[in-house]
């Protein structure tokens, strides 16, 4: 028997064993190289993760800033609207005593006296003109009776027993109240009905 023909105990020729082992080594080598990651690839992967995190943070920051700007714009619009609505408040507060004086003049005027008729008519027209002007700018008079007492627009001065007006309702107006665009600038001083 030649050396090529020599058989190993397993029944294989030595060349066959060497070839089998060589194939196994070749099969193992690609696996080893796959396990060894190129450091550049690892660095690229880390940088991609960092980039994604930075983009997420920037997106969140941009959204937060947009929301803050929208809130600021809305608050500014509301402030401007309130400034327009209530810019006249001080001026109206100065006019209220004049309107009250005209009201009192009409209350005490002798309307039966023909000599006073022209003066009473002049006061009535002046008061009407004044109220028309302030109504144009959002001022409303609070002077209704027989309505439920509302602490937002009424200030109770006294409680008076009454059979005609339900308890808790406004019985009489001592001094008119006024609102400016829905905001009470002076509460009406009222008497409130109570049950007997």
From Swiss-Prot:
Record-given protein name: Protein GrpE
Originating organism: Salmonella gallinarum (strain 287/91 / NCTC 13346)
Major subcellular site: cytoplasm
Assembly information from the UniProt record: Homodimer.
HAMAP family in alphabetical order: GrpE
Protein's gene: grpE
SUPFAM superfamilies in UniProt: Coiled-coil domain of nucleotide exchange factor GrpE, Head domain of nucleotide exchange factor GrpE
GO CC annotation: cytosol
GO biological process, one term: protein folding
Region (Disordered) location: 1-40
PANTHER family to which the protein is assigned, alphabetical: GRPE PROTEIN (PTHR21237), GRPE PROTEIN HOMOLOG, MITOCHONDRIAL (PTHR21237:SF23)
